[in-house]
Every structure is written in C-alpha cells, then in structure tokens.
C-alpha cells in the first residue's frame, strides 16, 4: 500500500516494514504516525509498505491458491521457506518497477526492523537513512526458542494434520495457544501486573476494557485495535482472573484473522535472520558495513529483543545513535508510545533529510 506522491525525481520514498502479524496497511498499526505533519508525512514522502512472503495479507503465502486457482488447492504446508532477505529483494524489484531511484528512509520494528537492516545493504547511495526499532541483527537462541514453542502448540493441535487442514476446519486451538505464548513475550511482567494484578474483574467491565473489537479486515500487529469494530462477548466459566480473560480474548481475536501455516512460515522466517550469513565472519563485521545514518530504537523493558541487542547494533554501525523508548510495556512499546516515536523520528528525519523535510508539500 502507499500514501502520498512520488516526487518528480523519484527520490522521496519512505519504506515502512511491518512486524510478524501485520499487513501493508500502516494506518491500522502505526496510524498516529501517518499523515501530514507527522513522522510519516504524506505531504512530503511517498510512503510505501509491502507485505512479507508468508503473510496471509498479501504477496504470496500458504493461503495462496496454486496456479491462481483455488480449485487446485492452496500451498499450505508446501509453501517454500523464505527469508527476511528474500522479502527485501522482492520489494526492491517492486520499487524498480515503479521507477524509484532512491529511498529516503526505511523504518520498522521487530520483524520489520530486521527488514530495515537488510535494506541498508543496498548501500547509502540508494537508501539514505534507516530506523530499526526493537529488533536484532540476528535471531537469538532466546527468540528461536519462543518461536519453536509457538509452532509446537500449533502442530500439537489434532486438526493441524501436518499442515493439510482445510479452511473450513483449521487448527484454531493450536493457533490460539501460540498467540497467548507470543503475547506474553510482547509485554512485560510489570505491564501485566499494573493492568490486571490479581483482579478477577467484572465480566462486563472486562469486556468493555479488554475485549474492545475484532478487526474484520484486521491487521493490527501485536497490540489490539483496528479499523472495523465488531463488539464481541467473551464468557468462560473458568476465567477466574482478568489476565486469563485478556489472553483468551486476544487469542480468539487473532485466530479469526490469521492462518496457522502462515504463522509457522513467518516464525521460521524470523529464525533465518542473520546479517552475517553469506557476508562476513561475524555480526559486528556485517553491521560495520552499514554506512547510512541510523537511529536505533530500544526499549529497556523489552524481554524479546532486548535493549542489549539494540546497543550491539548501535555500537557496531559506524553512523548510528541509540535512543530509548521509555515504557514498561515491553516489546509492544514500539506500537504504543506514539508520541515518543513521532518526536524521535521527526527529529532524525529533519537532521538527515533536510531537503525533503523543509520543502513544500508535493
């Protein structure tokens, strides 16, 4: 998807990279940053977001019809493995087709941050500056372990059938268990404790505060939200605590909009991420090849892609600076702390893209 206009010189492109379960519709998950006068200024930038391979929201994935014909079935578990690097190379071909000559900035968090770092290797003459947030230079053993636990939950569902399930009877329980596990890595202990504690809660109150909506065309990434709002009731006799109700509701909301084989494909993709692969002997050497001005955004309470990992990136990239998103909400803070993000991004863009930021609207 795109917003704004491509400049006559085709050099004002801003690429936004989505996270694991997001889509190309930036307005659904980073909406407060998109628009005139905001970080993703549509009066000045041609803002572009493209879906990753394996995502159910576009490009190609396990839910893609074979030969474009669903009567022949869909790829399902036979969908080939893809990497972060594959996505970036594919997206570069799209920009080439559009006649883009130069990318002004690439911005993304989590899985999107991995894409951002890969974009940098096209060189500073093509990509002018980058902003990786809450991400890593390579998938850590810690993150690989969490991904495997989630895949195991899906594969343990009797309806998974080695990935040969039908759309009419998918392995919902396995996907919901995977989502619950993931949600706990996206938040922090203090965040959940502050929000729920040992509250058993009033069911109606819990519905109003935590159930909110299911997005019918849904694309929120880790946090809840979305454009279409459909009220949902949630009632489980064994939901004694508000934290349980929250996890079960969010898992159900996710299973209504996502596919299990896609989830497996995308989490496997994360595990392939390694900037040094095929390039250098070490991660530090690979990062040292990134020459663009780089704003690394980290979150001290992030237990999935830790602040230490952001510090590693900032130390090794020659022209990088690290800024902290202040929040106790964990990994998801990069999707929540919009005012901080807007301020940090606008400052960085003014510093490194004055020719675009200071000119009149297109």
UniProtKB/Swiss-Prot annotation:
Database matches in Gene3D superfamilies: alpha/beta hydrolase
Residue ranges with Polar residues bias: 208-222
Stored InterPro entries: AB_hydrolase_1 (IPR000073), AB_hydrolase_fold (IPR029058), HAT_MetX-like (IPR008220)
Ranges of residues in domain AB hydrolase-1: 12-335
Biotech uses: Fusaric acid is phytotoxic to plants such as cotton and banana. It has been shown to induce programmed cell death in plants. In addition to a mild toxicity to animals, fusaric acid exhibits acanthamoebicidal, antioomycete, and antimycobacterial activities.
SUPFAM superfamilies for this protein: alpha/beta-Hydrolases
GO biological processes: homoserine metabolic process; methionine biosynthetic process
EC class (word): transferase
Active site: 110 (nucleophile), 302, 331
Entry EC number(s): 2.3.1.31
Keywords of this entry: Transferase
Pathway assigned to this chain's UniProt record: Mycotoxin biosynthesis
Record flagged with keyword Transferase: yes
Location of the region described as Disordered in the Swiss-Prot/TrEMBL record: 195-232
Catalysed conversion reaction: L-homoserine + acetyl-CoA = O-acetyl-L-homoserine + CoA
Coiled-coil region(s): none
Keyword RNA-binding appears in the UniProt entry: no
Top-level taxonomic group: Eukaryota
Pfam families per record: Abhydrolase_1
GO molecular function, one term: homoserine O-acetyltransferase activity
Alphabetical list of PANTHER family matching this protein: HOMOSERINE O-ACETYLTRANSFERASE
Family membership noted in the UniProt record: Belongs to the AB hydrolase superfamily. MetX family.
Family annotation (NCBIfam families): homoserO_Ac_trn
Job description of the protein: Homoserine O-acetyltransferase; part of the gene cluster that mediates the biosynthesis of fusaric acid, a mycotoxin with low to moderate toxicity to animals and humans, but with high phytotoxic properties. L-aspartate is suggested as fusaric acid amino acid precursor that is activated and further processed to O-acetyl-L-homoserine by cluster enzymes aspartate kinase FUB3 and homoserine O-acetyltransferase FUB5, as well as enzymes of the primary metabolism.
Name of the featured protein: Homoserine O-acetyltransferase FUB5
Species lineage: Eukaryota, Fungi, Dikarya, Ascomycota, Pezizomycotina
């Amino acid at each position: 998807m795109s917003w704004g206009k491509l400049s006559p010189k085709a050099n004002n492109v801003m690429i936004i990279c989505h996270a694991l379960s997001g889509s190309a519709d930036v307005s659904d998950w980073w909406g407060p940053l998109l628009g005139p006068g905001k970080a993703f200024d549509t009066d000045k930038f041609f803002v572009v977001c493209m879906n990753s391979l394996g995502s159910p929201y576009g490009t190609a994935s396990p839910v893609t019809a074979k030969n474009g014909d669903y009567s022949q079935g869909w790829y399902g578990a036979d969908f080939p493995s893809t990497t972060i690097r594959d996505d970036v190379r594919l997206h570069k071909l799209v920009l080439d087709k559009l006649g883009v000559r130069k990318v002004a900035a690439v911005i993304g968090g989590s899985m999107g941050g991995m894409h951002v770092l890969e974009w940098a290797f096209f060189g500073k003459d093509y990509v002018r500056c980058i902003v990786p947030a809450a991400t890593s230079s390579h998938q850590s053993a810690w993150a690989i372990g969490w991904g495997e636990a989630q895949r195991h939950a899906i594969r343990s569902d009797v309806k998974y059938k080695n990935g040969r399930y039908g759309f009419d009877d998918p392995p919902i329980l396995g996907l919901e268990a995977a989502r619950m596990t993931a949600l706990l890595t996206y938040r922090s202990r203090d965040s959940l404790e502050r929000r729920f504690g040992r509250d058993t809660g009033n069911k109606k109150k819990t519905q109003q505060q935590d159930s909110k909506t299911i997005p019918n065309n849904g694309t929120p990434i880790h946090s809840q939200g979305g454009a279409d709002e459909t009220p949902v009731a949630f009632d489980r006799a064994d939901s004694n605590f508000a934290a349980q109700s929250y996890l079960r509701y969010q898992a159900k909301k996710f299973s209504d909009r996502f596919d299990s084989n896609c989830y497996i494909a995308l989490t496997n993709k994360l595990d392939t991420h390694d900037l040094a692969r095929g390039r250098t002997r070490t991660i530090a050497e690979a990062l040292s090849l990134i020459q663009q001005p780089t704003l690394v955004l980290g979150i001290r309470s992030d237990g999935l892609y830790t602040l230490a990992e952001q510090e590693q990136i900032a130390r090794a990239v020659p022209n990088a600076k690290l800024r902290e998103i202040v929040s106790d909400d964990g990994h998801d803070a990069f999707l929540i702390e919009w005012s901080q993000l807007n301020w940090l991004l606008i400052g960085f863009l003014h510093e490194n893209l004055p020719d675009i930021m200071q000119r009149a609207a297109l």
